UniProtKB/Swiss-Prot annotation:
GO terms for molecular function: small ribosomal subunit rRNA binding; structural constituent of ribosome. It comes from the Bacteria. Belongs to the bacterial ribosomal protein bS18 family. Transmembrane segments: none annotated. The gene is rpsR. Keywords: Ribonucleoprotein, Ribosomal protein, RNA-binding, rRNA-binding. The keyword RNA-binding applies. Disulfide bonds: none annotated. GO terms for biological process: translation. GO terms for cellular component: cytosolic small ribosomal subunit. This is Small ribosomal subunit protein bS18. Part of the 30S ribosomal subunit. Forms a tight heterodimer with protein bS6. Binds as a heterodimer with protein bS6 to the central domain of the 16S rRNA, where it helps stabilize the platform of the 30S subunit. NCBIfam families: S18 (TIGR00165).
Length: 74
């Protein structure tokens, strides 16, 4: 038996009843990108496929409008 009990991942957007992920909501988007600027995969965050697609589109739009960086500050 494993020593740890791993908590089941769940989609935060489904639980909160979010209709659409907005690209202007930077606080939410920053939780789903790494410090190097990559989009975190759904197998790590637990986000459902529908919201992962919306999340990727929102991050890409925010990057295009220079609201989020494409990469880290190096």
């Amino acid at each position: 038996m494993s020593r740890f009990f791993r908590r089941r991942k769940y989609c935060r957007f489904t639980a909160e009843g979010v209709e659409f992920i907005d690209y202007k909501d930077l606080n939410t988007l920053k939780n789903y990108i790494t410090e190097t600027g990559k989009i975190v995969p759904s197998r790590i965050t637990g986000t459902s496929a529908r919201y992962q697609r919306q999340l990727a589109t929102a991050v890409k739009r925010a990057r295009y409008l220079a609201l989020l960086p494409y990469c880290d500050n190096h």
